[in-house]
């Protein structure tokens, strides 16, 4: 059984017991979160596709912790003009463990 949820403007395919990183959520470590934006639920041959969400479907997850991804470098350069600009960015994330899929 798996589901597709929407979080932080992205869609994630989740399975019970899986850990995944989503955009930063305002929740304490150890807290339980419920996702109501379930776009699809697949249980064997039974497939439920929402329009836009599946009614009554929920995915619960436990917050493991928060962190930051690896740094990415943004480089701007104008050739022959001796202009170079560097910037770095580290995006915050929340790590979740999926505890249940219902619906």
From Swiss-Prot:
Coiled coil: none annotated. It holds the Pfam family Ribosomal_L21p. Keywords: Ribonucleoprotein, Ribosomal protein, RNA-binding, rRNA-binding. PROSITE patterns: RIBOSOMAL_L21. InterPro entries: bL21-like, bL21-like_sf, Ribosomal_bL21, Ribosomal_bL21_CS. One of its GO terms (molecular function) is structural constituent of ribosome. This protein binds to 23S rRNA in the presence of protein L20. Belongs to the bacterial ribosomal protein bL21 family. This is Large ribosomal subunit protein bL21. The gene is rplU.
């Amino acid at each position: 059984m798996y589901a597709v949820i929407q979080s932080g403007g992205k869609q994630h395919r989740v399975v019970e017991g899986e850990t995944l990183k989503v955009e930063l959520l305002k929740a304490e470590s150890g807290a339980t979160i419920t996702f109501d934006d379930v776009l699809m639920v697949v249980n064997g041959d039974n497939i439920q596709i929402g329009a836009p969400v599946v009614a009554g479907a929920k995915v619960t997850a436990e917050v493991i912790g928060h962190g930051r991804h690896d740094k990415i470098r943004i480089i701007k350069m104008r050739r022959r003009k001796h202009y170079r600009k560097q910037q770095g960015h580290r995006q915050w994330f929340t790590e979740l463990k999926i505890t249940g899929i219902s619906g």
